[in-house]
Amino acid sequence: MFYSILHTKFFLMIVKNIMKKYLNIGCGSRYHPAFENIDVNPAHPSIIKHNVKKGLPFPANAFEAVYHSHVLEHLPLDKGKAMLEECFKVLQPGGIIRIAVPDLEKMVRF
């Protein structure tokens, strides 16, 4: 968990300093004011209510960075693939995408 938090903070530090348009998918209650935040159950009025199983509500090349943490594993395989395609569609050329998923191998060992 600490490793994930450290990398997320590092990612946010880099992105905030060099990029202007970033998308945070499935943010839950951890939305970032500098991001365009979307979630199926928004925890704050500034978060866009949207189900990613229906695609992303943004045009192509809209963001310099796309981030989602612990979202992909909640989707069926076909919807997960479709969401990844959508992420790359809304990502500008040369943009950054960061995806965090659980380490299933580590979980099985315990």
What is each model feature region?
Residues M1-M19:
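Membrane-proximal basic amphipathic "stem/tether" segments
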Residues K20-G55, E105:
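Class I SAM-dependent methyltransferase SAM/SAH-binding core
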Residues K53-V66:
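A short acidic, Gly/Pro-enriched loop at the edge of an enzyme's catalytic core
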Residues A65-V71, G80:
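A short beta-strand submotif of the Rossmann-like class I SAM-dependent methyltransferase core
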Residues V71, C87, V101-D103:
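Hydrophobic adenine-recognition pocket in adenosine-nucleotide-binding enzymes
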Residues H74-L75:
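A short His-aromatic
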Residues K81-I96:
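A short glycine-rich, Lys/Arg-flanked "PGG" loop and its adjoining helix->strand segment in the class I
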Residues I96-F110:
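Conserved class I S-adenosyl-L-methionine
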